[in-house]
A protein has these predicted regions:
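Non-catalytic, soluble scaffold/interaction modules
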Residues: 1-317, 322-329, 359, 367, ...
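Conserved alpha/beta-domain cores
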Residues: 244-534
Length: 534
């Protein structure tokens, strides 16, 4: 018997079940170069593989929005150009050309600091895997063949792997790679499947069909458990399921503290599917819609109409509140179709609202789309990375311009739409009392705020322990912002990781926070803490 401790808990739960090894065929690209007279044939092989993958993704996209982004990537002209140029110029065979181009694309995402964006590298590799399988003429594994309950164990799992997950049969998931913001983690949470990711070397320690015990909440895997350990985990599982049922029973109870304060529980999302996944939690709305993913998963700056379609659907789903953060790129978030100048310190450079105010036509396309969507639900506009009153006023002025343009077109929108801002820099904290007179609401972004206040790169493992939003300097900043907002009568929310941290709930309630916005998987636990608050 061996006990393995794991750091990355993607989805809580306890399982005692046998393992199903979900292993891919060998997709290692063939080596060697090609002759000049083979170039056209290799390009045609790629075209056939691409067309087959695009057709398959198109069918999947009709069932699940996640694959709409895959479809955009598969159709990306830069991907096609990258593969074809390697075949023509480097005389790479088609397998090598696909592999190298996919690696380059994936590295763009993998090098990003933001965990959610870092995980999008897996989406790119998913497309590469599909193309390679077509070229090699091999079949990929299929969870649809399962006939009995198992814990699925894999090197990694991509969105296409998750399509056929049946929660009645897939009782747990363990992967050697991946992070807590990967698609498999997000889908596992939405389906209530216990999941552990980033478990290095696990495939070499377990045999197919072997029973294991798994506590995804505590981050523990027991390999080759004895009878006594199995019974212990079965008892823990029964107790856990009873607790989950109790928490789910609280979902229809509004988050009101025992002293009568109504707290708003919202979800952070990156797309419409995320909203659907969060709705069963009985959320009070969406506290953060990351609009940048519409841009990053595209092959061009999305048009007003393309954005409107998405925002409209989101507004209809999150009818109580949909807070759309305007484009937040720069820093570690790049666009495949727009070349950013190299900067010494991109996190301190041209990013977020600075880009939007410099690229006014692009910004107004987004603002008009948001305004039009506001006719279909309670939509709020939130500006990121504001550090000066001039930025906030200029952004609001552009909204007013867009309103006039929509009036001229005769298109409906909420004439009283709320316009707020992220508080995520020391400057915005120090000027919070002034901003509160101009903004309709605040949302504290503790991820960047903590990084900037403490001068700590949260992606740097050497100083990761210093990244701590419980640091008194950060707590004082949060207190100052909440007090400034309340003095002017505006709502103050939080959409950073701290909002979903159970250890932080009591403190944030003490400070007077009005709205907690977090990943859907944390909402049940935070709700209970709020209800028990004296």
């Amino acid at each position: 018997m061996e006990q393995i401790r794991v750091e990355k808990t993607a989805s809580r739960g306890i399982v005692v079940e046998k393992v199903y090894m979900y292993l891919e065929p060998d997709l290692t690209p063939a080596t060697g170069t090609i002759a000049d007279d083979q170039v056209q044939a290799e390009i045609e092989k790629f075209a056939a593989a691409k067309n087959a993958v695009v057709e398959e993704l198109g069918q999947l996209a009709e069932k699940n929005e996640i694959f709409a982004a895959h479809l955009e990537i598969a159709n990306d002209f830069m991907l096609q150009d990258g593969v074809e140029s390697k075949i023509k110029d480097s005389k790479s065979n088609v397998e090598q050309a696909i592999s190298n181009t996919i690696d380059e694309f994936a590295m763009i995402f993998a090098s990003m600091d933001d965990e959610y964006m870092k995980e999008r590298a897996a989406d790119v590799r998913d497309i590469g895997k599909r193309m390679m399988a077509v070229v090699k003429g091999v079949k990929l594994p299929d969870l649809g063949v399962l006939t009995e309950p198992v814990v699925v164990m894999a090197k990694d799992m991509y969105p296409s792997d998750t399509v056929k997950i049946n929660p009645a049969l897939v009782k747990g998931i363990i992967t050697e790679e991946g992070g807590v913001t990967s698609h498999v983690s997000i889908i596992a949470k939405s389906l209530g499947i216990p999941t552990l990711v980033g478990v290095k070397g696990i495939l070499s320690k377990v045999d197919d069909g072997e029973y294991i015990c798994m506590d995804a909440g505590e981050g523990v895997i027991v390999v080759k458990p004895d009878e006594e350990t199995e019974k212990e985990y079965l008892d823990k599982k029964a107790a856990y399921e009873q607790e989950r049922a109790r928490l789910e029973g609280l979902r229809n109870t509004p988050a009101v503290t025992k002293d009568g304060k109504r707290i708003y529980l919202c979800a952070n999302v990156g797309n419409v599917q995320d909203i659907r996944n969060a709705l069963p939690m009985n959320i009070d709305g969406v506290g953060l819609f990351r609009s940048e993913f519409l841009y990053m998963q595209n092959t061009h700056f999305p048009t007003e109409e393309e954005q409107f379609v998405v925002y409209k659907e989101a507004a209809e789903l999150a009818s109580q509140e949909l807070t759309i953060r305007t484009l937040d790129i720069g820093g570690d978030k790049e666009l495949s179709y727009y070349e950013f100048e190299k900067e010494e310190n991109p996190f301190l450079g041209w990013r977020a609202i600075r880009i939007s105010l410099d690229m006014k036509d692009m910004f107004k396309e987004q603002l008009r789309a948001i305004l039009r969507a506001s006719a279909f639900g309670h939509v709020r506009i939130m500006f990121p990375m504001i550090i000066a009153m001039e930025e906030l006023k200029n952004a609001k002025a552009l909204v007013k311009e867009c309103m006039k343009e929509l009036d001229e077109r005769g298109q409906a929108y909420d004439k009283n739409i709320e316009m707020g801002m992220m508080i995520e820099t020391p400057a915005s904290v120090m000027l919070a009392d002034e901003f509160a007179k101009e903004a309709d609401f605040f949302s504290i972004g503790t991820n960047d705020l903590t990084q900037y206040i403490l001068v700590v790169d949260r992606g740097n493992k050497k100083i990761a322990k210093m990244y701590d939003y419980f640091n008194p300097a950060v707590v004082r900043a949060i207190k100052q912002v909440i007090e400034a907002g309340h003095k002017e009568g505006i709502k103050v929310g939080m959409c950073g990781e701290m909002a979903g941290d159970q250890k932080a709930v009591e403190l944030l309630l003490d400070l007077g926070l009005d709205e907690f916005s977090m990943s859907a998987g944390s909402i049940d636990y935070v709700r209970e803490q709020i209800l028990n608050r004296e």
